[in-house]
Design a protein with these regions (language model features):
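Conserved core of the PLP fold type I
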Residues: 63-207
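N-terminal small-domain helix-loop-helix segment of the aminotransferase-like
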Residues: 2, 6-104, 111
Length: 208
């Protein structure tokens, strides 16, 4: 017997993936240059040359160590470099020990949700949202996913709806800007208003 909730997820293929496969099938017929695929965020420009050079330098090193395990937190020198970059740009005082590297954003979100979720917690996502958020929250972290609709005229945050959704069980709000899939970028005014609302709710409920 397998987990029925996971089986249900597997029985419903992602609409995004369906569109992606349709784009591939059309490209095989009419040519890739004639298909404009907006289904998946694949890059349409090459990586910076510095990235290419760095990859080549890594592959030219010890061929055995290249394919070995790193620290569970990620390579120490990379974490130190990232901490230095954050400190330089934002005036922070991070060290490499403050950072944890993952293989992509999905793994980072999943780990973070599981790390902070407790029984009965709720996570708020702002629609439209990346569908896997719901799976990370409910199946991965065992929490409740609460969806707040956007202000449809500009896809900024509907603060009346958000304020209504916030309660003592709210553990986190997932903020994604530029938004996936709408592409909307939250304005400075939106971010400041969000910070004010959260400060108000923190005082009301006695916790972040």
């Amino acid at each position: 017997m397998i987990n029925q909730s996971m089986a249900a997820l597997g029985n419903n293929r992602s609409t995004i993936r369906e569109l992606f496969e349709y784009g591939n099938s059309r490209a095989a017929v009419v040519g890739r240059e004639n298909v404009f695929d907006f289904s998946i965020g694949n890059p349409n420009v090459p990586a910076p040359d510095a990235v290419r050079r760095a990859i080549l330098e890594e592959t030219a090193g010890d061929p055995v160590a290249l394919h070995g395990y790193t620290s569970a937190q990620g390579a120490a020198d990379v974490r130190r470099t990232l901490a230095d970059d954050l400190n330089r740009r934002f005036g922070t005082d991070y060290t490499g020990d403050c950072l944890y590297l993952t293989a992509g954003a999905a793994a980072a979100l999943s780990c973070a949700f599981q790390a902070i979720a407790c029984p009965g917690d709720e996570f708020i996502v702002l629609a439209p949202y990346f569908p896997e958020y719901k799976m990370f929250i409910e199946s991965g972290a065992g929490a409740k996913c609460v969806v707040v609709p956007p202000a449809v005229q500009d896809f900024q945050i509907d603060f009346a709806a958000l304020a209504q959704a916030l309660n003592a069980r709210t553990k986190a709000i997932v903020i994604n800007s530029p938004n996936n899939p709408s592409g909307a970028v939250y304005s400075e005014q939106t971010i400041r208003r969000l910070a004010g609302l959260l400060a108000e709710k923190e005082e009301q409920y006695g916790h972040p």
